[in-house]
Amino acid sequence: MLTVEVYEMSKKIDIKFKLTIQEKIEIFNIIKNYRTVRSSLIEILKFVQKSYGWISNELITELACILKISKCDIEEIATFYSQIFRQPIGRNIIKYCDSVVCYVNGCEKIRCSLEKNLNVNVGETTKDFKFTLLPICCLGNCDKSPTIMINDDLYSNVTEYSVIVLLESYQ
């Protein structure tokens, strides 16, 4: 999705991109645990993302200003790590394991079922912002594969049919 489209979409869902004083205080508390500001960036981005759901261009600009580092430095970290989201994501994050073991045990059928029922491709978010579908290389549950995680809930031995029931429980 183009950045301009994402920005326009975010305006429609009325997201405010301004850090509160309390959030700024917490950011400086995070920095205290690190030797440099740059080394604290991942934790800062995770903290900000927890509040806003994703890291917008406006938040990067504001962080650069208060941390006195370049936007490029922040963008570099934000785009490198797959768990830092640079566009709006769904209320429910679905991660399907695509490791070798899950692949052998049918993760492709799971992926196809999820894509069909959500009407999205991998890496996309549903139009109603209920779900985002992401691959993950291993959920550490290989003996019970295929496995998916929805938010913090792990589901084992899933089938292309059982994922449909799971989706309904998160509506």
From Swiss-Prot:
Domain of life: Bacteria
Annotated cofactor note: Binds 1 [2Fe-2S] cluster.
Cofactor: [2Fe-2S] cluster
Chemical reaction(s) catalysed: a quinone + NADH + 5 H(+)(in) = a quinol + NAD(+) + 4 H(+)(out)
KW NAD (keyword) present: yes
Residues the record lists as binding [2Fe-2S] cluster: C97, C102, C138, C142
Known partners and oligomeric status: Composed of 13 different subunits. Subunits NuoCD, E, F, and G constitute the peripheral sector of the complex.
Record's protein name: NADH-quinone oxidoreductase subunit E
